[in-house]
Amino acid sequence: MIWQEKIDAALDARRVADALRRRYPVAQGAGRWLVADDCQYLNFSSNDYLGLSHHPQIIRAWQQGADQFGVGSGGSGHVSGYSVAHQVLEEELAEWLGYSRALLFISGFAANQAVIAAMMAKEDRIVADRLSHASLLEAASLSPSPLRRFAHNDVTHLARLLASPCPGQQLVVTEGVFSMDGDSAPLEEIQQVTQQHDGWLMVDDAHGTGVIGEQGRGSCWLQKVKPELLVVTFGKGFGVSGAAVLCSNTVADYLLQFARHLIYSTSMPPAQAQALRASLAVIRSDEGDARREKLAALITRFRAGVQDLPFTLAGSCSAIQPLIVGDNSRALQLAEKLRQQGCWVTAIRPPTVPAGTARLRLTLTAAHEMQDIDRLLEVLHGNG
């Protein structure tokens, strides 16, 4: 098979399965409204959970940072790209989340890949939740360490895997809030079992940080758990982009030496770090509390109104509210019908989710109003 035949065959297979992904150019894609093709939609596909992407204080911080530092960092943090803005943000994140150190990354995907690649050797073992994010599972599959996957949130299965002989170290990998189902990991039980087998715990809390817990400190804080490695991202609750790894002093020093994604990538712009500092200030403030309370009320309203629809509603109390449809083509048809009625909803299909679990992945944000939820429910009931 030549290259073009290989590519064509892969694309054809996706088309036949109604699994071909598309991008839609939007004029506005975050916040309450999405604008595409000169049409305005209620936006139920955004990760901007607290509605901070358009916060004037955060926008102003980025603008002022660009005036002060320019629009780029100018290099890797190991060369010339680590500014005082990066340093102060790392210190503020570490203090907020109760860790000795924080290291900034350009994305959550890069952070997860970097940590696993740097930490793991062939004699070690990775034990990951089966529904962990693609960045975690891909990093684990590319690692020289063997990967074992435990059934979703099944601590008993995890314990059995950890109990089997391993010549090296064991790293347990999970998420705080799972990106496709919106449910939470039983972190306290997972950490207890991990410690019983002398392992370390790595938690990706992309969808919890800023959104849940006291001052938005996330899933681990809420469950009174402190993993050895905590990954937080800034494209969700913070409304910006980027990520950080929270860890001990010695682990931070180790990653600075061996995490290639950190060493060989240009740092995020200092202006972005300034915007993230402003976002963190909002998240920790009374305004942040009010936004989280509003989001919780919107979630409650949605779940109460969707119970009698002929779809499977995932057991999620988070901003991620999936409606499991099952069939790929049915999910696509429903998403299109909702868009025709003014609600922008995304159909998620395999391989992103397991076969037979195609879904409408609805996300609610603090930028929404109660009437938006009521409109969504009205449209869903009309198409159920």
From Swiss-Prot:
SUPFAM superfamilies in the record: PLP-dependent transferases (SSF53383)
Residues binding pyridoxal 5'-phosphate, per UniProt: 108-109, 179, 207, 233
Pathway: Cofactor biosynthesis; biotin biosynthesis
Cofactor list: pyridoxal 5'-phosphate
InterPro entries with a match to the protein in the record: Aminotrans_II_pyridoxalP_BS, Aminotransferase_I/II_large, AON_synthase_class-II, AONS_Archaea/Proteobacteria, AONS_Proteobacteria, PyrdxlP-dep_Trfase, PyrdxlP-dep_Trfase_major, PyrdxlP-dep_Trfase_small
Protein name: 8-amino-7-oxononanoate synthase
Pfam families, A to Z: Aminotran_1_2
Organism: Escherichia coli O1:K1 / APEC
Subunit-structure text: Homodimer.
Residue numbers bearing the N6-(pyridoxal phosphate)lysine modification: 236
Signal sequence annotation: none
Alphabetically ordered keywords of this record: Biotin biosynthesis, Pyridoxal phosphate, Transferase
Keyword Transferase found: yes
PANTHER family: 8-AMINO-7-OXONONANOATE SYNTHASE, CLASS II AMINOTRANSFERASE/8-AMINO-7-OXONONANOATE SYNTHASE
Encoding gene per record: bioF
Annotated residues for binding of substrate: 21, 133, 352
